[in-house]
């Protein structure tokens, strides 16, 4: 199993709208991609009036990650309205091989 994460930040005033946007885009895309085992959106307020977003997803294999992200799966995937919200963004994603889990 593969874990994938990405990080970005928006103005806290835009956090609810951006969360709704991620629900409609990235989270739906995760859920509809074969091999996805779940996705989570994490948030926290940070200094400077920003809210940080982390998307975290689990995948059956790197082939499943490629089906979502493309051949260069390390590059973050963005959607048309992301520029409207994001004031910080990681351009790449982190990936880990899951070697132990307490869940099924």
Language-model segments: residues:
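Intrinsically disordered, low-complexity segments
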Residues: 1-3, 13, 90, 99
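Short, well-ordered beta-strand segments in beta-rich or mixed alpha/beta enzyme
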Residues: 2-9, 38-71
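Non-catalytic surface loops within mature trypsin-like serine protease
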Residues: 12, 60-61, 97-100
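Short amphipathic alpha-helical segments
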Residues: 12-38, 75-82
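Intrinsically disordered, low-complexity acidic/polar segments
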Residues: 15-17, 64-66, 102
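Alpha-helix boundary recognition
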Residues: 23, 31, 66-69, 87
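Residue-level detection of beta-strand scaffold positions
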Residues: 27, 53-55, 91
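Glycine-rich beta-strand-turn "strand-cap" elements at beta-sheet edges
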Residues: 40-51, 77-104
